[in-house]
Amino acid sequence: MDVALKLLLLAALTLLASAQTPIDYKDLSTTLQEHIDKALEEGNRKFGGRHHVALDSFVTPAVTRQSILNVNVFLKVTTCMKTRSYKHRPECNTQKRSTPKINCLVCKMKNGTELVHCARKIDILHGEHKEIRDNCDVTRIGVSSLMAQTMPDDYRKQVGCLGCI
C-alpha cells in the first residue's frame, strides 16, 4: 500500500511540475499565441513599468476551442526595457530581481465576452480578484453528452445507454 501511495504522489508531483515548466512560444499554435499576446499586453500595461513583461509558464493546460476559452499563464517582469510591442520577445527571458510573478487569465465569460485579467500571483493565491475571475464560463467538455447522462430521481444504471449512471 505504501508503494502505491508513493507512486501516486510522485505522479501528482510530476504532473504539477510539467504544468509549470517554461514555454517555447514559437512552438505554440497561432490561436494560443494570439490569446497569450492579449495577456502579455495587459501584463505589460499593469505591471511592466519601464520593463518588458514576458511569458513564463502555464498555470493550467490551455483550452482554445470555439465555445470554450481558458488560457491561464504566469508572466514575469524581465530585465529588458519596454518597447512599443508587447508581444513575446525571445531575447527577454531573465526575470528582474524583486518582482512578483503575474497570473494572467484570458477566458470567455458567461455572457460571451472575453475577459483578460492579470494580477500578482500572491493576490490570486489569497483569493483576491475571485469575483472577477468567477465570471469565466467553466463549461467542461462532455458535460452535456450522452456519456454524462444521469436519470433524475433514479440512480439505477439504465440499460442500453452507453455511459449512463
UniProtKB/Swiss-Prot annotation:
| Record key words, sorted | Disulfide bond, Signal, Stress response
Q: Which domain of life is it from?
A: Eukaryota
Per the UniProt entry, the signal peptide is 1-19
Does Transit peptide count among this protein's keywords? no
Q: What S-S linkages are listed for this chain?
A: C80-C92, C104-C118
Q: Some GO term, biological process aspect, for this entry: which one?
A: multicellular organismal response to stress
* Induction of expression: By oxidation stress as a result of either short or long periods of environmental hypoxia.
Q: Does the keyword ATP-binding apply?
A: no
Instruction: Please describe what this protein does.
Output: Involved in hypoxia tolerance.
Q: State the domain notes.
A: Seems to have a cystatin/monellin-like domain.
Q: What is this protein identified as?
A: Cystatin-like protein
Name the species this protein comes from: Clarias batrachus (Walking catfish)
Upper taxonomic lineage: Eukaryota, Metazoa, Chordata, Craniata, Vertebrata
